[in-house]
Amino acid sequence: MTEFTTLLQQGSAWFFIPSAILLGALHGLEPGHSKTMMAAFIIAIKGTIKQAVMLGLAATISHTAVVWLIAFGGMVISKRFTAQSAEPWLQLISAVIIISTAFWMFWRTWRGERNWLENMHEHEHDHEHHHHDHEHHQDHDHDHDHEHHHHHEHGDNEEYQDAHARAHANDIKRHFDGREVTNWQILLFGLTGGLIPCPAAITVLLICIQLKALTLGATLVVSFSIGLALTLVTVGVGAAISVQQVAKRWSGFNTLAKRAPYFSSLLIGLVGVYMGVHGFMGIMR
């Protein structure tokens, strides 16, 4: 095979590199690249564009690293070692991590709602106790005290409703603006989503290695990964922008967003189960 430097001089590399980027982008549109999980994750945490980019890049980095590890590992371990033989094991590992992530998302949302309800219950109890003490120390006549009590109760009820609404809105904002999800958790989820190898990229790299054209193979794999990153980042950013726009234009979005993490965690869990079953069946063959 022609050396990469020669291809550069001939101008052929400028055809290979864009082609590899385009193939990577198209490859990212194929099923099985965690696009559904990434979109569900971004929607669940109401992630920002920065977090969406981070998620897509993390998935691409792990995807590229797996290609290199399998290619070189396969050459060291056995000539019969292929991407097809390693894929079921990686699917099984990814399934375990993905299901764990789905469970964590579900538990985090459920715990947050319980804590909020308990805090509101304690606030209501303390408010009623304070109201009782206020009545006890009144020095007015009975009729006036009764009227004052009625008016005060009505005002407190309105104040409580306003406080309840504000607390609920702040809780939704706190839970779904991404602040509770650390960058490390986003990176971990992205790295997990990119563990499934691409047999085509591994095959190209192996051919280039065997033909002693490592630089060319590395360049093609990196270009392929750039195209894949463009697709995954676009999916994540699209989900993030959609959430932000819907939240601005639809007042009822917060009500829906309160339940979104449950649906997202369920969807992610189902994808993880599917990957686990598929990987297990591949191992048993």
Swiss-Prot record:
Belongs to the NiCoT transporter (TC 2.A.52) family. RcnA subfamily. One of its GO terms (molecular function) is monoatomic cation efflux transmembrane transporter activity. Residues 135-146, 153-164 have a biased composition (Basic and acidic residues). It comes from Shigella dysenteriae serotype 1 (strain Sd197). Induction: By nickel and cobalt. Transcriptionally repressed by RcnR. It is found in: Cell inner membrane. Keywords: Cell inner membrane, Cell membrane, Cobalt, Cobalt transport, Ion transport, Membrane, Nickel, Nickel transport, Transmembrane, Transmembrane helix, Transport. GO terms for cellular component: plasma membrane. The chain crosses the membrane at residues 11-31, 57-77, 87-107, 186-206, 221-241, 263-283. Efflux system for nickel and cobalt. The keyword Isomerase does not apply. This is Nickel/cobalt efflux system RcnA. InterPro entries: Ni/Co_transpt_high_affinity, NiCoT_RcnA. Residues 32-56, 108-185, 242-262 are cytoplasmic. One of its GO terms (biological process) is response to nickel cation. Residues 127-164 are annotated as: Disordered. It is a multi-pass membrane protein. The gene is rcnA. Residues 1-10, 78-86, 207-220, 284-285 are periplasmic. Its main location: membrane.
